[in-house]
Amino acid sequence: MEKNNKEDVTPLGGYILAKDPISFNEDRPVIQLRVRNSGDRPIQVGSHFHFFEVNKALQFNRAAAFGKRLNITATTAIRFEPGDEIEVSLIPIGGKQNVYGFNNLVDGWAGKSPVAIDEPVETTWLHAG
């Protein structure tokens, strides 16, 4: 058995980076949406949050975001400062596409079927586009 050189040993708690960048979600269909924070507080949206159900103060085409999440790495988020307008990339939610919780607007399957935003949602949740 060959001994490691001092340069080859990773220190305790250390890590080794890959030579090539890691890619993800390459085979997923992506849409772009323009989102504006019309509120007076910063809003942070996590990577796997059902984007259709994000904070009411975010203005965007909610119907287009149905069944989708941010196209960012897991455990990360995008922060929208008050007045910010940001273009985001969204991809379909994976797996069985069952969405429960969040803001309880769906609580069921969020697959490819179109969504009708009913009047209570339209009047209480900002909608642009």
Curated annotation (Swiss-Prot):
One of its GO terms (biological process) is urea catabolic process. Pathway: Nitrogen metabolism; urea degradation; CO(2) and NH(3) from urea (urease route): step 1/1. Pfam families: Urease_beta. It is found in: Cytoplasm. One of its GO terms (molecular function) is urease activity. It catalyses: urea + 2 H2O + H(+) = hydrogencarbonate + 2 NH4(+). InterPro entries: Urease_beta-like (IPR002019), Urease_betasu_sf (IPR036461), Urease_subunit (IPR050069). Its EC number is 3.5.1.5. The keyword Acetylation does not apply. Keywords: Cytoplasm, Hydrolase. CDD domains: Urease_beta. It comes from the Bacteria. One of its GO terms (cellular component) is urease complex. Heterotrimer of UreA (gamma), UreB (beta) and UreC (alpha) subunits. Three heterotrimers associate to form the active enzyme. Belongs to the urease beta subunit family. This is Urease subunit beta. It comes from Photorhabdus laumondii subsp. laumondii (strain DSM 15139 / CIP 105565 / TT01) (Photorhabdus luminescens subsp. laumondii).
